[in-house]
């Protein structure tokens, strides 16, 4: 395949970001929809500007070339991308193939720094995006806050431990969390639990996962009594996990924002 660089790649990626925001919007609840709608509008405006009111489909057709876009996305987005968003985008844009690689945002940041040939980076937190931008590896004018997520406490279906609120994580005998060293969900978990005075009390019960999907899978398999993931993760396994509660208001210093941007070629 032929890989595009510069403005052409930028416009295709921005059109993709706008479409993916719109696709995610369809599956959100009302409050999330309002947040995502604003992000969709921002991404769409950026896409229209960069593309000079063309679409990725028209651009590709005009050149007659096949284009492959590699998206490096947070592990919590894998199901949404693979099951819905990528097929939706490819159907609307013949000649453009989208491949995804998924891991914790911290690990993806490191991979991009070490030469991963990604076209688009979608992080589960602003920290990793800011770091890459400061290193000159991101097209700064393409950074868009695309989605807002929620941090939730989950338990296996049945809730045998009878947890009722976020703070009840203390009652669990085994807990799955993302590793705060590289997993944004783990960083959010540490912050919330520290602010609630719980973090130090549960350390001997915690198993740390290398990405949020590992945490979700541990709870879904009942290998852990409880875990902390994103609301979107919990929704993807609603038949195997239950949401006990969202992180309490004030326990996190900022909203859980997923930024997206084009990686410099």
Language-model features and meaning:
Residues 142-151:
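Short, glycine-/small- and polar/acidic-enriched structural segments
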Residues 23-27:
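C-terminal motif of bacterial Sec signal peptides marking the signal peptidase cleavage site
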Residues 119-123:
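Periplasmic-binding protein-like
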Residues 1-7:
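Short, Lys/Arg-enriched N-terminal segments with co-localized hydrophobic residues
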Residues 29-47, 51-52, 56-92, 103-106, ...:
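Exported/periplasmic ABC-transporter solute-binding proteins
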Residues 10-17:
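Sec-dependent signal peptide recognition
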